[in-house]
């Protein structure tokens, strides 16, 4: 996945698959050349629950994939 790929998702809801398992759903607000991303209105989603976490920065190394947002 290249950094240019993320440009089309700026200010839209995305689903981020994490290397440790689970997902983050939120609005993509920014990114850098290392694939670190800024999410607003974030929600951690795993097999058992959904946890609202607000704004956060995710390191590129913790990300498996980023896709268009969808309902869980």
Predicted segments, located by residue:
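Conserved RNA-binding domains used in RNP assembly and mRNA/RNA metabolism
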Residues: 1-72
């Amino acid at each position: 996945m290249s950094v240019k790929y993320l440009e089309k998702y700026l200010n839209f809801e995305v689903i981020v698959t994490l290397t440790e398992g689970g997902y983050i759903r939120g609005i993509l607000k920014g990114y850098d050349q290392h694939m670190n991303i800024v999410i607003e209105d974030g929600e951690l989603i795993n097999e058992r629950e959904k946890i609202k976490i607000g704004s956060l920065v995710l390191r590129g190394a913790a990300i498996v994939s980023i896709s268009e947002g969808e309902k869980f």
